[in-house]
A protein has these predicted regions:
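N-terminal active-site segment of His-dependent metallophosphoesterases
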Residues: 1-61, 147, 151-155, 174, ...
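Active-site metal-binding loops of divalent metal-dependent hydrolases
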Residues: 6-10, 51-54, 76-78, 111-112, ...
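Metal-dependent catalytic neighborhoods of phosphoester/phosphodiester hydrolases
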Residues: 16, 50-67, 74, 79-93, ...
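Short coil/turn linker and secondary-structure boundary residues
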Residues: 21-24, 74, 164-166
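Short, conserved, surface-exposed binding loops centered on an aromatic residue
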Residues: 39, 61-65, 98-100
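Conserved acidic residues
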Residues: 45, 68, 123
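Conserved beta-sheet core of the metallophosphoesterase superfamily
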Residues: 71, 86-191
Length: 194
């Protein structure tokens, strides 16, 4: 099973309070996030963290996660590539990655995109960074019934009522119900990919 979550921000007090995470302080958030991951993500699953893994102690927080197969999609708080390579392995860190979610081409990036590879053909895009901020999500919704979604803890709280990563079945259920971009009909001559 593939699992996706962005922005855990371990040890990042300012983000935990700014984002209104429903925990009492950073230690409580850290424990809540680790419990949510380990309760749902099996040791042999694939776990994709879409950026902003931790403020400090990446090795410590990686050891707290039981899953053996973790891929980090770097975010704006994921500095120190050498340290991260030592924690995750050089072949497990990307700025952008493409995977299949129930057979659907899916672009993973920390940042939301208006257009992504094959977006006009129904591909998915998973991102973080904006922490499911309503004004930002509404701005993205102006682009139409897009097949992209925020997979942050704030988004999981809204979808499930509690914090947990999204699995590939969640992603497929949510995004397959959306119509998706119809950009070729909106652009002159069908656009560049027609």
């Amino acid at each position: 099973m593939k699992w996706f979550w962005s922005d855990p921000h371990f040890d990042h007090e300012a983000i935990a309070s700014k984002m209104g995470r429903k925990t009492e302080g950073i230690d409580s958030w850290n424990a809540c996030a680790i419990e949510a991951i380990n309760k749902h993500v099996d040791r042999h699953d694939q776990f994709f963290i879409l950026g902003d893994f931790t403020w400090k102690r990446p090795g410590y927080w990686r050891q707290q996660i039981n899953c053996k197969h973790i891929t980090l999609i770097r975010g704006n708080h994921d500095d120190g590539i050498t340290k991260l390579q030592n924690v995750f392995g050089a072949g497990n860190i990307y700025d952008l990655r493409v995977v299949k979610v129930r057979g659907v081409h899916t672009v993973l990036c920390h940042y939301p995109m208006a257009f992504w590879d094959r977006s006009h053909k129904g591909s998915y895009h998973l991102y973080g960074h904006i922490h499911y901020s309503a004004p930002r999500e509404k701005l993205l919704d102006l682009l139409g019934d897009r097949k992209s979604m925020d997979v942050s803890p704030e988004a999981s709280l809204d979808y499930f009522g509690y914090y947990r990563p999204f699995n590939e079945d969640d992603i497929y259920t949510i995004l397959s119900a959306r119509k998706g971009h119809d950009f070729p009909k909106m652009l002159p001559n069908g656009g560049p990919d027609a």
